């Protein structure tokens, strides 16, 4: 069976959609309360300090933004968590395509990530672990771009710095 490049992207987007829907819908229907770390981030978000006794501020900042948009709807925080994860999957897919020069292997690399505990069962709880994933994925991706260039572009170096700072603040 031949799989064409357009089909790989379709399979990838189907996978992202299924992941987003399942990992948003199931906790929304089965959990009575938000996870404790998400509630903690909501409490911290009301202060918007530059750090807290347990964690850096990024997760509280982002949860506060979502609270201002969606209010106290629990499903929104499960959705927020999955947005961070599927965005990370998207960056890993792009990174894998560039490294491996093969879209099938790039898709397999993302599907293998789905098998890692931190990309599935723990993702409904928006906490610092979920918050930092896209920042570190982007830091690695742009670091690879910088190291792969004969003469690094200033723009790419600044982007690495911005995403690394986002990772540290997560």
Specify the residue positions occupied by each region the protein language model found.
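Start-transfer (signal-anchor) and selected internal transmembrane alpha helices
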Residues: 1-23
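Short helix- or helix-capping micro-motifs
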Residues: 106-114, 164, 168
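Extracytoplasmic catalytic/substrate-binding loops of multi-pass membrane glycan-assembly enzymes
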Residues: 26-41, 50-65, 71-76
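Membrane-interface transmembrane helices that cradle and orient dolichyl/undecaprenyl
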Residues: 97-100, 139-157
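Short acidic/glycine- and proline-prone juxtamembrane loop motifs at membrane-interface regions
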Residues: 121-131
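Alpha-helical transmembrane segments of multi-pass membrane proteins
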Residues: 82-86, 109, 129-143, 157-160
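Membrane-interface alpha helices of multi-pass inner-membrane proteins
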Residues: 47, 155-170
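Transmembrane alpha-helices of multi-pass, membrane-embedded glycan-processing enzymes
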Residues: 63-67, 80-91, 116, 132-135
């Amino acid at each position: 069976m031949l799989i064409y490049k357009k089909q790989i992207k379709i399979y990838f987007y189907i996978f992202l959609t299924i992941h987003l829907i399942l990992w948003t819908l199931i906790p929304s229907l089965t959990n009575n309360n938000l996870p404790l770390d998400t509630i903690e981030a909501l409490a911290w978000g009301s202060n918007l300090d530059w750090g807290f006794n347990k964690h850096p501020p990024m997760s509280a900042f982002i949860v506060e933004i979502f609270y201002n948009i969606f209010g106290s709807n629990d499903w929104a925080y499960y959705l927020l968590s999955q947005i961070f994860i599927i965005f990370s999957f998207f960056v890993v897919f792009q990174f894998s395509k560039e490294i491996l020069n093969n879209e099938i292997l790039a898709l397999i690399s993302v599907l293998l990530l789905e098998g890692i505990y931190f990309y599935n069962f723990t993702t409904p709880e928006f906490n610092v672990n979920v918050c930092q994933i896209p920042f570190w994925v982007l830091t690695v991706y742009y670091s690879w771009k910088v190291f792969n260039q004969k003469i690094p572009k200033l723009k790419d170096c600044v982007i690495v710095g911005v995403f690394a700072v986002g990772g540290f603040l997560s």
